[in-house]
Amino acid sequence: MTKPQGTGGKKKNQLTLAQLAAYDDILTDALVDHAYYWTTIPKNRTSYHPSRGIKEEEITKIIQNHLIVDPDIATAEEKLLATDGLKRFCNTLKTPREQNDFKAHLRRYMSIYLPDCPFEVNATNRYTIVTYEASITARRFIQRNETIKYLAGIQVVITPEEELEMSLRKKDFSLIVSSRSKSTSLFMGPARFANHDCNANARLITRGQAGIEIIACRNIEVGEEITVTYSESYFGENNCDCLCATCESNLRNGWRPVDGEAAVQKSIEDEQPTESSTPYSFRRKRRYGSTALQASRTPSVTPDMRPRVLRKSQSQMMLGERTSTTDSAAQGAGADGQSRKRALEMGTPPFTPTKKQKTTQYPVVPIALSTAPSRGSSDNETSKSPLSFSTTNDNVTDATSQGSESPGPIILSPEPTPIKQAIGLLKQEEGVNEVAVQQVPEAFTPPPSQPTEEEPPMVRPAFERLAARDRMSIANLISGPSSPAPPVVFSVAEVTTHRPKPQTLQLQKTDQTATISTLQTVTAAVQKEAPVVKTESPIKPTVGQVEKITQVQTTTKSCTPSKPKAQAAALPQHHMPVSTAPRGRVPHDYTLTPLLLSEPETAWIMCTHCASAFVQKNAYLTKSTCPRCERHSKLYGYMWPKTEKYGPNDKEERILDHRMINRFLTAEEEARARGRVYWRERMGSKGKQGSSAPSTKGTPAGEKNEQSAKQEQSQGQYVQERFAVRKKVKVQVRSTVPTPVIMTKKDEVAEAAALGLRRSGRARRVSAKLADCELDF
């Protein structure tokens, strides 16, 4: 009886999936995301929100003082649990068992910052390109069969229902399948950051009831990613969708080339550059003839520190993936016309339209035929028809009409008249004089005698547009109720007003404006089961006062606008079907890609320390190290992968205040990274050009030194003479200035009275009587 109770109590005290997910989410948020981590760890619960009580400065200070400089896990645990965020969460745990489980999981994450930890948490975008996921990188050499210290975790068995729910929420990134029991488990802790690889360098080992450890299968070098094998069919059957590094190097599974694509060869960029190589500059022209920036002209040999990645415009990126909205319903025979239309649209830019067609913006929707059509139907209703479009005021509104050839004119009657039987509709293929036939009324009645316009427009059939449509026959359109239906209007021709005046055209003027509707009325007597008649011979419509059409062929090149030779060469004569297959992954498409340069002033940078590429936002000033090296330097005070002093003879100073370190390039390095010449070098080259170089050319080094010394001595004498001359002039000026005479107030008053001045300095006014007396005397 005691044994079942013990096992029952043991199962009862096991961690559940909800508890373990809650512990792991808040600990990864506090000890990884808020420890100078440049991205975020994916959380197990979608409802998780970062705690406001977790502050980065407070967390990193505890890590530095109590885990890195003076390792003490007990003190660090006490300090971390005293922070607002973790203290608040720990208070929500009701039982001591839950609190102990949470503290044990906390110690697993604290251990990854100890100086003797052989790995470090990194990030990679290999799997999704646009988002970063966690990974594990070795920062010291790990021998084969060595248990990777602190890379441990805890697992919990999940049910199939929980597994299905996690897969639907895309949270199945930490699932492992037992090779013996075939049960699925979710493992948490630092071990969850190890990614899958088909040829992994480590393996998962179960320790105890729910513990997990990782042991190296072979020697692991510094900077190498630590990987494990999740399952044989984790990423589809036989891992057919795996995107690991092994599959990437072998071009298999998720990296296999798409049918019709050539296999991508390994680039020599992966090789380490030699010491003699210099950075490559992408500048097309040197501003200055300096030899300081002699670089290779092959960009794949020595990539620049700041490589130039061309950003594709949105239209270029989506050109190969977009599909036609107007031809969404076209199937079968309409595929040829559709591919031809798409080839023209992709090969050459369209005209700038004055009024965009609605058929190029909205999908084609079958329209029910009206029971009472009238001649006064609006143009808006007409333009919504899938077989109609218009041109106005000599402006080409066909977005894909550039480079297309217009067939010859066809004359139709604008008046609805009864017909006897159905015949075919002409269809013109490009460069072919043959006539394809569809079901339309056989004969057309002539229009009433009307005075022609002074310059009537030219009417041409829209055969190219009809070829790109659904090719729905009139019999299918008009098949409906059993009772006879009234006449129906269909679009057969297109009107353009920029062509010369035809000799065989007469139309009735239906509008006061210059717009001519593209719908010319054709009536068809709709019957319940009308026989379908197809003919391959050209049609001769009986049109009065109009010459008959002898042939239907493409118009001359003079009717189409001129096109550059480059565009003409880019358009092949054969069909260009649009590929709808999904684009496969290409090796190394997650580095130096323009997909991550969506924001302005964002650039790919090469790390000066580990030579890895990274994306820097707001790259007005270029950073010198990647986020991984920068985070390590902020935490440990040393450059990656150093964590502590190597011995008593190591004199390198540890700098824990990251604000004292300049993380950007110097002005000279910035200029060279951008392919420019530093201003000191530029000024130095100008000074050398302005000096007396020809006089010293060919002289020995000793004579050059003597000449330069004489020049400096002469320049110094000249400067001294100039200062002496200025001093003499100042002395002479001072000697010529008269010495001031000191006068008392009485003397000033007497002098002013003698000069006839007042105290204020104004002249005294002399009266006229005194002036006359002075004149008499």
From Swiss-Prot:
Enzyme class label: transferase
GO MF annotations in UniProt: histone H4K20 methyltransferase activity; histone H4K20 trimethyltransferase activity
InterPro entries referenced in this protein's UniProt entry, alphabetically: Hist-Lys_N-MTase_N, Set9_fungi, SET_dom, SET_dom_sf, Suv4-20/Set9
UniProt GO cellular component terms: chromosome; nucleus
Transmembrane segments: none
GO biological process, one term: methylation
Chain intervals with Polar residues compositional bias: 291-301, 371-405, 688-698
Keyword Manganese (UniProt): no
Top-level taxon: Eukaryota
Keywords: Chromatin regulator, Chromosome, Methyltransferase, Nucleus, S-adenosyl-L-methionine, Transferase
Family recorded in the similarity comment: Belongs to the class V-like SAM-binding methyltransferase superfamily. Histone-lysine methyltransferase family. Suvar4-20 subfamily.
Function: Histone methyltransferase that trimethylates 'Lys-20' of histone H4 to form H4K20me3.
PANTHER family: HISTONE-LYSINE N-METHYLTRANSFERASE KMT5B, SUPPRESSOR OF VARIEGATION 4-20-RELATED
Name of the protein in question: Histone-lysine N-methyltransferase set9
